[in-house]
UniProtKB/Swiss-Prot annotation:
Pycsar (pyrimidine cyclase system for antiphage resistance) provides immunity against bacteriophage. The pyrimidine cyclase (PycC) synthesizes cyclic nucleotides in response to infection; these serve as specific second messenger signals. The signals activate the adjacent effector, leading to bacterial cell death and abortive phage infection. A clade C Pycsar system. The lineage of its organism: Bacteria, Pseudomonadati, Spirochaetota, Spirochaetia, Spirochaetales. It is a multi-pass membrane protein. It comes from Treponema porcinum. This is Pycsar effector protein TpPycTM. GO terms for biological process: defense response to virus.
Length: 115
């Protein structure tokens, strides 16, 4: 009977250690996910800044009356295309960042639940 009690106590002690390791791993996983979200947020902010600068350049040239009408039209078309390229590429990069964060979060938390 004493041997059985000792085996049960050893097993429960091992479970406590395993649970502590899992809790610590979960805590570090959430920290990693939080840092990934901050990284994505920073990238989104940078892309919005680039878009704002592009729109500012577009408005500046579009309202510049010193250019001839022909040049103004060419500049408008070029700046519109440039702004469109920046906008589309930034939207793609934002979605890639969000997908990266979601996939990383799923893999971090998935590793915890599998173990």
């Amino acid at each position: 009977m004493i041997g059985l009690t000792k085996v049960c106590w050893t097993m429960s002690k091992k479970e406590v250690v395993d649970n502590s390791i899992k809790i610590e791993y979960l805590r570090s996983s959430f920290d990693n996910v939080q840092s990934l979200i901050q990284f994505a947020d920073q990238k989104i902010g940078n892309l919005l800044l680039i878009d704002t600068i592009t729109v500012g350049i577009f408005i500046t040239y579009a309202t510049n009356y010193e250019l001839s009408l022909k040049d103004l039209t060419v500049w408008n078309i070029l700046l519109f295309i440039t702004g469109l390229i920046f906008t589309v590429s930034s939207v793609i990069l934002v979605y890639k960042s969000i997908i990266k964060v979601v996939c990383s979060a799923q893999s971090e938390l998935g590793l915890f639940y599998k173990s």
